[in-house]
Amino acid sequence: MLMLASASPARHRLLQQALIPHQVMVSGVDEETIHHLDPVRLVQHLAEAKAGVVRQQIEAALPVLGCDSVLEFDGTVFGKPATAVEASSRWQRMAGAWGLLHTGHCLLSVNGERLSETVTTRVLFSALSDSEIEAYVATGEPLLCAGGFALEGQGGLMVERLEGCFSNVIGLSLPLLRRWLLVINE
């Protein structure tokens, strides 16, 4: 059993689908206040902050997992778009191009051990027409996800190819978590 320090329904579903027993507690960490770090350090910092806050709030003897994801596109960090206009603008740029989806992970074990790592997956977005972009943005899905797309949803139709960990793009590297759980359960 572990405690997931995340408000992400996608991460919760990944753990459910992988049959990893867990509970969810939202950390309340304000992700918008930190912008001065490069994308890899940003997601790692936020993952560690989320896990740390939840670790302090719970009394249960559970490992705590914090995660955070952003899309890096042409050197720019794309978190969740704030508006449909912003989502459309991003998709105009991303269509037919590669981006890097970074997910920071931090697992705090019961005995105080801290495991931290960022996993990066290359994402090739499909070449899209303006009407395809408008239709996707109109679903509202892009406003809910880092990078403005959900691989496990309709956004999966807009992704041509991945290089790296599939589940990482959804918000959590399951292979990394498996390795970590083996380490802390030894």
Swiss-Prot record:
It catalyses: a ribonucleoside 5'-triphosphate + H2O = a ribonucleoside 5'-phosphate + diphosphate + H(+); a 2'-deoxyribonucleoside 5'-triphosphate + H2O = a 2'-deoxyribonucleoside 5'-phosphate + diphosphate + H(+). It is an enzyme of class 3 (hydrolase). Its EC number is 3.6.1.9. The active site is at D68 (proton acceptor). Its cofactor is a divalent metal cation. GO terms for biological process: nucleotide metabolic process. CDD domains: Maf. GO terms for molecular function: nucleoside triphosphate diphosphatase activity. GO terms for cellular component: cytoplasm. It holds the Pfam family Maf. This is Nucleoside triphosphate pyrophosphatase. It comes from Prochlorococcus marinus (strain MIT 9303).
